[in-house]
Structure formats: structure tokens, C-alpha cells
Amino acid sequence: MASSTKSVVIHAPVEKVQEYLADPMHLPEIWPSLIEVKDVQMLPNGGYSNRWMYKMAGMRLEGTSEVIERIPKERSVSKTKGAIESTQTWTFEPQGEDTKVTFSVDYTVPIPVLGRLAEAAIVKLNDREGDAIVENLKTIVEAT
């Protein structure tokens, strides 16, 4: 299993940041390899489930995602299933008028699809993508 953790401080209140991330339709705006989010459905816990399409190493991978935990002003945890199995955690820490956002993901690289030789390269690319995700989030939330 691979993992990555990235943090960024956003000049916005926790509520604004968490509200933006709560809508899975926003994720392709900040996540470069996330091609599509569809079939979004509200869950009783205040989160959502959805289907997604993701591009990894030039291949299109599909699956589902579901928010399994949502604590206002604190964190949101999602599980993905399908071509990529993962647990994604967003944590939110107020810092005066700003919010420190940390994005952690634990995931399985789909070895049968991509091959063992590609695994190290994929992990490195995904780690860089984590930087882009939090920086894109900062740019969009601060601009709105």
C-alpha cells in the first residue's frame, strides 16, 4: 500500500474549505488526474457517494467513492473501491482567519493493470499530484 500526506494553509475559514470539498463535483477542478465524477448521491451522514473516472499512467480507471465519516470543522474520510482501493482523509485545523488543510491518502496501486515496474514511478507521480491538489484547492477557495 502506498500513502501520501500533503498540507497547505488557506486564507479562508474552515467552514468555507470543508463546504467546497464536501461537493464531489468540485474534485476534478483541483485533482489533475480525476477525469470525471458522476452519479452523486447524498448520504445520511451528510457526505456523498459517487462514481469516478481517474487517469493513471495513461490508463482510465473507474470506481466508486463514499464518505464514511464527516465531522464538521474537523475532518472528512472517504473510501474508494474499484480499480483503485483507497482511504482519503481531509483534516481541517483553524489557524486564526486561516485553515490548515491536510490531505492524506492510502491507496493500492493496481499492479495487475500497470505492472510492478511502473509501481515506483506511479507512487512518485501520485505524490507530486498531491502537491497540485492542495495548491489548486488553495487557489480556488481563496479566489471565491
Listing of model-derived features with the role each one plays in the protein:
Residues 1-44:
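Hydrophobic ligand-binding cavity/cleft-lining segments
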Residues 29, 38-84, 132-144:
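Glycine-rich portal/gate segments that line the openings of hydrophobic small-molecule binding cavities
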